[in-house]
Amino acid sequence: MTPSLTIAHIQTAAQTLAAHLSPTPLLNAPTLDDAFGCAVYVKAECLQLTGAFKIRGALNAMLALDDAARRRGVITFSAGNHGQAVAAAAKLTGAPATIVLPESAPKIKVERCRWWGAQTVFYDPAREDRSEVAGRFIQERGLTLIHPFDDLRVMAGQGTVGLECVAQLRERNVVPDAVVVNCSGGGLASGVLTAVRDAWADVPLYLTEAAGLEKWQSALQTRQPEQRQPLTDTVLDGINGPSVGAAPLQTVLAQGHVHAWSVGDAQALGAVRLAFEHLKIVLEPAGAAGLAALWANKAAFTGQRVLVIGSGGNVDAGVFARALTT
């Protein structure tokens, strides 16, 4: 059976990462609460190193490698944010990195991978399997794969987001009525769910994915990892991955009381604007997907307290400008 993530994994990751990464703020604004009709607490992972939560899992996995593996180098496949994170983690630990990216990856994410010193390799999602592309490099060069979500070390690192949220909410004497998390492969969702459920056993989790993909909605019903063809034209690149991870799914199913929502481009762009206007932060559309989903379902949460993970802020200027004028 695929192993599930535990709170002990996350606590160990938090100890490992404490010397390398700073906590991100949990933001709340009266004007945002008024707009939603409920108290909204947004975890600003857009302010983390590399502009997204992904550095937590990537660095936790990198620090677990032995010196020989680091010298040979690492590889990953990514829509961009995990690629940046692996590139940064490799740079910080003295390892070479190769990042396999879709040809449609946002320019800012490609540039940041290269800024951190990584080699970038592109593939066509319509014709190629990203894991097979990475597999060729692994076979030829002996590289170590840092999987974007189906790896307990990565999941544990992402779970430190939830651990911080628990501490920050407790400081304010707030018990959340619901948690909303953007979701693609499931590394962040499984990590946050594990941390939050350790504190509050009954809080429901709402996963948010890209409309037209809905692999998690299906996976929660079939209880099997789902595979989908990525969308060809979307600003939700950060949650446009083709597959549900086996380990994240096992963790989520073991916890239960999990629901799946989906949002489209227009909704996500609207949420980018909401975050900027009320919280003064920059989220990418995928990073604002949870906020968009809550907005679409806000009538069901009137008067409640909702934790939303703002997972990243790596957005091209043109897309951000489009969001502000939507």
Segments (PLM) and residue ranges:
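PLP-dependent amino-acid enzyme catalytic core
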Residues: M1-T326
